[in-house]
Structures are given as structure tokens and as C-alpha cells.
From Swiss-Prot:
Top-rank taxon: Eukaryota
Gene Ontology terms describing biological process: transcription initiation at RNA polymerase II promoter
Record's protein name: Transcription initiation factor TFIID subunit 2
Chain residue ranges for the region called Disordered: 1044-1064, 1113-1191
Keywords assigned: Nucleus, Transcription, Transcription regulation
Biological role stated in the UniProt entry: The TFIID basal transcription factor complex plays a major role in the initiation of RNA polymerase II (Pol II)-dependent transcription. TFIID recognizes and binds promoters with or without a TATA box via its subunit tbp, a TATA-box-binding protein, and promotes assembly of the pre-initiation complex (PIC). The TFIID complex consists of tbp and TBP-associated factors (TAFs).
Gene behind this protein: taf2
Stretches that traverse the bilayer: none
Amino acid sequence: MNRKKDKGFESPRPYKLTHQVVCINNVNFQRKSVIGYVELTIFPTVVNLNRIKLNSKQCRIYRVRVNDLEAPFIYNDPTLEVCHHESKQRNLNYFSSAYTAAVSAVDPDAGNGELSIKVPSELWKQGDEMKVMKVYIEFSLDQPKGGLHFVVPDVEGNMAERAAHVFSFGNQNSSRFWFPCVDSYSELCTWKLEFTVDASMVAVSCGDLVETVYTHDMRKKTYHYMLPIPTAAPNISMAVGPFEILVDPYMHEVTHFCLPQLLPLLKHTMSYLHEIFEFYEEILTCRYPYSCFKTVFVDEAYVQVSSYASMSIFSTNLLHSGLIIDQTPMTRSFLAQALAQQFFGCFISRMSWADEWVLKGISGYIYGLYLKKTFGVNEYRHWIKEELDKIVEYELKIGGVLLHPTFSGGKEKDNPTPHLHFSIKHPHTLSWEYYKMFQCKAHLVMRLIENRISMEFMLQVFNKLLSLASTASSQKYQSHMWSQMLVSTSGFLKSISNVSGKDIGPLIKQWVDQSGVVKFFGSFAFNRKRNVLELEIRQDYTSSGTQKYVGPIKVTVQELDGSFNHTLQIEENSLKHDIPCHSKSRRNKKKKIPLMNGEEVDMDLSAMDADSPLLWIRIDPDMSILRKVEFEQADFMWQYQLRYERDVVAQEEAILALEKFPTPPSRRALTDILEQDQCFYKVRMHACFCLAKIANSMVSTWTGPPAMKSLFTRMFCCKSCPNIVKTNNFISFQSYFLQKTIPVAMAQLRDVQNLCPREVLSFILDLIKYNDNRKNKFSDNYYRAELIDALTNSLTPAISINNEVRTVDSLNADVRLILEEITRFLNMEKLLPSYRNTITVSCLRAIRMLQKNGHIPSDPTLFKSYAEYGHFVDVRIAALEAVIDYTRVDRSSSELQWLLDLVQNDPVHYVRHEILSMLAKNPPFTKAADSSLCNEALVDQLWKLMNSGTCHDWRLRCDAVNLYYTLFGLTRPSCLPLPELGLVLNLKEKKAVLNPTIKSEQIPGLPEMTPSMTFINTLKEEHVVMDPALSGVAMAPLSLKRKAETPVGSAPEPGQVLQEEPSAKITLKSREEEDIDMDTVHDSQAFIYHHLNMLERPSTPGKEPSSVEQAILSMPGTPMPTLSKESTSSKHGEHHHHHHHHHEHKKKKKKHKHKHKHKHKHESKDKDRDSHAFVNSPASGLSIRSPSLSD
């Protein structure tokens, strides 16, 4: 591992956490609240440790004790409200900088936190080094908005009968939302977890269940869990509910939990989990690292699967019975991913956010190996191609994904991804889409490393990481071995070079340290004289999201004499490559042609070019570069490639290329593939849609029955009566998927009038009519849903005559038949719901298409009723998608408002996230176009949503930022009025200064600044503000401490700082109290000010601003609360502090002087207001003082 010898991991904290107790002694489902305490055992690493910073969000802190002494504390969370509510700023550049600064200010990886505890002086003033400190914190959570999710169904019965349950969730490190901790992946410790719950409930958590103790009255019981393996707080979780319990019949240390009445589904779903265990243990040659494993299936899950130490929480919707085909591979995949993350992600953690790619890469890579073993090589290669296409499309459209972001300084200027509208410095500022692509790229890069060093070495590296971690986990903390359980990029690379002896530096530099993919264009000519293939490969490396590739590239050429691999060197400026051919063109001899896999086949060579021996050419067939290839070869070459190349990726590429060649030979090649049983089913499904496109292009010359009809009839219909389908038999999954897909593809066929041919429609209606599933051992719900999708695909726009009113009577006869079928299906669903309500989902989509094509009146009412809380989640998402589409097409502000209300109030986090994602993908308007929907109220509402409305869910906040960006871009939204100009009269120098924040030009490289009216109005500086916009509401530079301010009349946030009106007794505090060592209490504020000041640095070159203007110029464009007697009275303490600080910073460089001075002025003012937090301990002054639990 790459670390300084014997130093271990360099911690950003002045102490080492060794053990933590979490005790939740009350879970109240009625009130949705929990009460408990934590106790952290820490070893100071400095003499005189006088302050401890921890992470805690939304917890109400009652008391803090350090070694049984009451300890004062300050709670400050700048992420609650990123920019103050008074701020007039509305541009995203500004928000992103402020948000990054706020997240950094409480980032545990930088040693920061929301909770700052002052160690009682009697503990550190003794002078000797403290051996150990125990920090005890009592806290409660009331109706948490993040971190813990309560599901309490609104039905009859007690909580257990209602299947009420609660579970922890979060995006990345989010444990601080439900208990105070060091919320960092690099701070490991051992754990003791206790949960007291009603006797009818079960509590599941990490580690081993040591004992379960009933209370005296037998009404409650306490579950005691011990986790002896050092684990990071973000990997700790809990779930409490009336779970049914299944001990895995194959592995007794594995236990599964599900909600009441789902046990039969659980048994079936989990019946093959042991195979996944065996597979991973075998390839890693390493035992599963924990002594037990628990799977918990919950409703309203945040994501499909989340992994924690020795347990995973899954969505209950992944459970299925043996009748279901389509869900099975999906659920298996999620289980395999969860188990891979147990090894890499939970057991082995990361040193810093920049090393996240290693863990995500390894777990994704070994999951891919499982996929290959279980579902076969074709499925695996198809998956790699899909993932590669996804990342290529994302990077070319949005911009590069950077796996290993390095930040040299604290300055935002060295932004490695200027093309993104969010910072990648923290996991909590990333868009969800970007993070998914990040994970996708990480495992693809691991595969590139495997190509370079071989799979054998790759698995040896993983084994080495695991065995080192395994040894370390059993050590006592004093041995400083625990850092071996953390992986870093450099440690991983060192391990690779030690094991394989190969230098993969260039590969890492290309794919990990920089972003972008490669874009190749290829074409060729055959030189008959020299018998040489002249290949030209060009690159586009100037477009967004691309990079230049220099290095080897493999080209495979299939000739008459066989298949030949060539490795070409892509140099700086070489485009043309000469490749010698092995075969002379000899078409007269009848001889079998050898393929790549050793097979020899007869081919009909009549289509090929008489002068050339080339059958087809492939660039980078192994996908060993992250690239997009656009290759030009003749249509007959693509047809040969489709028919005879055995690699599924090559077949997919050929199908895609043949869409551009709508000719009878293309039609024959595609039909042959459809009829080939040996061909991979996904390739055949893809060929169906390609054939439909080709048929539509050839509509005037097409002969015979509609495409695919005769094939379907031959495969699935009765011999005696070809229009009646056989009773369903889905024993062969290959033909099942084909049977589902062909009707959907056929429905895309169009005749000369661009309508779906009558023959096709009656064919689909007959399939629905004669569908018979009585003798089938599998459910046909997915098949019937696809038949409804086929009806939807057959719809074409209605021809309306002089805007007649649409009624059911005036419906076209065909459309009427479709509408009747959909209505019948929907009514049947109410009586006999299908698995996952697949039928309802398809019906809702069909109804929206009927509306969009003008057959029935456009109306969102039906969709809104299906989108209500209480319906199955898939149905809600389908209905919401329809409402979002309606909003865009009809420009409906009331529906947009309804959607945004759901985002703020819906109980299900996943649904809120999906609404914002779908709105960003299908926006009601974009920044390019004018729209009546774009108005000041909407800007304010979205700003409020991302500024403070989503502070308890990182993912949702980033979704809101995404939507804001989609609608308004980075700069000030165009629909906002320009702020009026303000004049500042400087009475000292007797001149007027134009408000310096109103600038005509923007400095390149700095975010745009909006002319927000920020003035400093203090008596000392003698400024008069003449500003029509803010007459009388001059703003005082209070610090971001106001973040925690609560609107008048609303209840305070739990644990939030309350501002008191400072009175004389505070300003005349004793000198001793003022000296309490809190000089960095507000480094979080200082940090943010530092960032914002850099943004808003005055642009007047040359002259150093005069001391008076200085205050105005360096004013950050942050929110400023109105001037009150508070800000004037806090002037008193300012002089004393100000000089003290100024002296401290004299050594700073001259040019930064005014900034620092300004910063400290704010800081000291705050400090003055805050230092009295400690006047009477423990939590008096600023924090909410509640009677302690033990009182």
C-alpha cells in the first residue's frame, strides 16, 4: 500500500476514533421519531485537544458530556440554507460555488463537522497527554426528512399489523442524518449497536446479534449488535419492522428479512444467493469478510439496493415468484452487485473521495465476472457494449467524466471539469446521472486494466488487498494497522505493479486522470496491385467530451482465407495504415471459409466485390479503448458481418449500420438472423426493430406479407388456423423474448399513407383476443403488457377536419378498437392486478399516446389520480411521466405547480427524485426558448427548493440543481427583471460610487455576478445608501451563521442555533470568557467567505481600493440580513477582536490584505456573538436546551 512507512493513514482530525456505541432506545411510529444516545471513544493525537468536531444533521442534541463532564457545543450547518433568503442572486454559478463551500465547511474528510464540542478545560489544562476520551451525546430525531425513512401505511390495526417499518438510507456518507458520528469513509472503528423496539418488531443492524433482551413488562425488547470489524460510519445502517425471517437453507450465517406475507416470494428470490457467495469466494480466493450477512427488503426504498457492513437493504419490489421471467435476471444482478460491494466498499473502504473509482470499479468488475459465468459470454459482451455506449453518449453530450479528480489547492479556480454545472469535489455536489456514469466508467477502466495485465494478475491484486485488510481488521487499533483497510489510488496502482510487474501508468493517465472518450472515423480502400488494405483512421478530439488517443489499436480483417488480427500504432499525425492481405481474390474455387472462432462455413460470395478478398473489417473488436467508432464499409460487408461473425457486439454493430441500407439483401440478412435459433436472443430482438425501419424505407417496393408476420405465424401460431396463436408456452426463454418483441416491432410498420397497415393491427388485436395462458407454467403479464405497447406503437396522428370537437362517437374505427382493448385491460387490472402492475403501466402510456395523437382530448386528470401516493411505484412513475409530457406540450403552469408540490411533499424519496429527473429530461421549456411558464415566481420556487428545500437529501438537491440548469442555464434567468442601479455616497471622500457589484463586463473564468444590492451600512464607515430597490433595508454583513435562522413563527430545526437579541450583559462579558479558545469555531464561515470573496474580487485593475471602498468592494454577494440593533450592538466587541486578528495576519501577502481583513471583521463579529454559547454550559446560549433524557 502506498503510504509513508509506519505513519499509517494521515487523518485530518487531531484524534483517532476507536469505538462507537449507538443506542436507539425509542422508536415511535406514530410520531415518526427516535430517541437515543451515542458514545464515541477517542484517543487524542495532540496534547491539549480542546475541541472535537463531529457530523450531525437534523438531530436535536440534548446534552454532550466528555468523560462525564458537561461540555458546551455549537451546532452550525451551512448546508441548511446555501445562500441566505435575502440574497437576490439567482445564477447557478454563484449557487454552485456557495454550495461547494458549504459542503466543504462541514466535510469530515477535511476534519470539519456541523457539531463543534468544546472539551472542558479541566480535561486538557492538566498538561499531560490524555489517554482516552469518551464523548457522550443524547439526541432525538423528529419526523426526519432524510437519513431514516418511516413507512407507516394508513390502514387499520396496530403498527405491526400495518407493516409499519423504518430504515436508514442516504446518498454516499449520510449517517450523520440519523446519529452524530464522524461521517467519513476513512475513519474506521468498532461498533456496538442497540435498538429497543416494540416486542412485535424486529431490529436489524450491522454485525452479529449478540443477545435480545425483553423489558420487565415484556412489551419491548432490545437487540444488541456487535461489529468487531473496524467500519466507517457511512457503512452502518438499521431497519426496524415486523419482518418475517428466513434463515438461508444453504448458508446458516445468512438471514433474510421481508415484510409480512411475502415469505414465499423471499424463499424463491433468495434460493440462489449461495451460488453468488461461492462464486466471489472462489475467484477472490478469500472468505466473505464478515461473520454474517443480512438482506432486508423494505417498501419505498431510496434505491434498488444499498450496501452496508454485513447487511444490504433492497427494494421489496425485487421479490418475485417462480412464475415471473423478466424480473429474475434483474433481481439476480442486484443481489450480485450488493454482494460485490460487501467486499469492496463496505469491508474495504476508501481513503478519500478521489479514490472512490477504485472501489466502484472493482465491485463493478467482479460483478461483471459473475454476469459472464451465470448468463454467459454473449450476455457479458452485450452488457459491456451497452455500458460503453452509455458512457460514450453521456460524455459526448454532457462532457467528460473524471474518475480521479485532484485538487492542488483549496481554490475553486483549478476546476478540473469546467464543462459541468456542478462541482465534482464532493460526492454530495454531483448530479445523480453523473455518478451513475462515473460508476459505469470505473468498471470499464478496470476491464482495460485487466486487458493490460491479465485476469489472473487482476484477481491476485484483489486477493492481496483483501488479505491485507483481513489481517488488519483483527488487530487492536494501537497497531495503526487499520489503514490497510482503506484503499487509495496510489496504493492500488502500487499493488498492480508489485503483482504484475507491469507499468500501467499511461493507461491510468489516459482514462483515470483525465476525462473524455475517443471518437474514431474509419474508412478503407483495397489496393489490388499491392494486395494491400489501405485503412484510414481519423480522430475528433476537439469536440466536448473527447480526448486524443495515441497508442495501439487492434483491427480484425476477415478475408477469404481466414480472419487476421493486426495491431496498428495510432501516432500523433498518422492517419493511413497499410495492412497486407493474405488472400488473393479467388472466388472460383468452392472452399469453406475459416472464421475467427475456428469454425469453417460455406458462404454465398456472389455479393462481394470481385477484386477484393475482404469480407468485413472491425476496428477495436475487443472494446479495449473507451471509444465511439464510425466505420464505413459496403453494405454487403455489413451483411456478411451480421450473418457470419460470431461475436454479438459485431452483430449489433452490423444491425445498426444496415438501417442505412434499406435493400432486399439487407432484408434477407436480417430475416435470416431472426430465424436462427443459435443466434443470441438480444441480437434477434434488435434485428426486429431494424427490419421494421428497413421495411418502412422500402414501403413502395416491399413484396409479400408485412415484415416478420410469416415468421411469427410459423413459430407461434396454429398450423391449421394461422391467425390464432397457440396457447402460451414460455419454456424456451429465447422464443419467449422473441414472441414479446415481434408484435411491438411490427406495430412500427407504416404503409404509403404513413398509417399502420390494417393487416398488422388486426394481427395484434387477434393476438390479444386469442391469448391463452392456462397451460403455461409462467406468468404472461409482461407479454400482455408488450401487446398493449404494440397497440400504442401502431397509433398515428388523427386527421382533424376544421377543429371538430373530439368525441368517442367520432373516433376512427381502428382507434376505437384500440381504446376498447385498453379500457378492458385497465378494468381487468383492478380486479386481477398483474405482477408489478405492468399492464396498468402500458395502458397509461397508451392513453397518453392517444391524447398526443389527437384521438381523445388531452387531459391530465386520469394520470394525476394514478400518480397519487398509495399506487404501486411503477404506476405512479408512468402516470407522472404522462403529466410531465402534458405539461410540456400544453404549457400548463398549473400542472407544473402540481408536480413541484409533489417534489416538496411526496412521502416517497424515490418518486420525488424521479419527478425532477424526468422534468430535466423532458423539460417544460429550455433556456433557449421563450415560454409563458418561465416567470419570476417559478425561478424563486426552484431557487428555494435547491437552496433550502432539499437540504436533507443530497440527491434531491442535485436533481433540483440539474433542473434549474436545464431551464435557466448557468447565468441569471432571462425572465427576471434587471435590478435597478444603486448609488453609494461616500461621505468621507464626498463622492458617489456606482454600486461596484454592477459590472458591465464579466471577467473570464469567474462566474457571472448578478447586480445584487449588497451594501455595508455601518455607522463607523459613514456610508449612505441611495438605492430605490432596498430603500431603508440596508444590509449588514452578518456571517453565514444566519444559515440556521428560522422564519418567524416556525419551529426551530432540531439542534439549530437560535439567535438571541444580544443585550448589554453579553457585550460586557468578562475578559476570561472572551478568551475561551474558540478561534476556529467559525472556520466554516471563514472558509465560505474565503470562497465567495474570491468570486467577487473587484475587477478594477491598478489602484488598491481605499480603505472605505474596500468594505464595499470585497463584500461577498451573499445574503445579508437586515440591519437590526443586533448588528450595531455587536460593534462593541469588534474593536478588540479586530486588532488582535489583524496583527495575526500581518504576515499575509499585501495583495490579499483587504480580503483577510474583511473576512476577520465578519468572523470576529460572529465570534463575539457565539462565544457566549459557552457562558453557561452545556447547551445554553445558542443551542436549544432541553431537559436531558436522564433528568
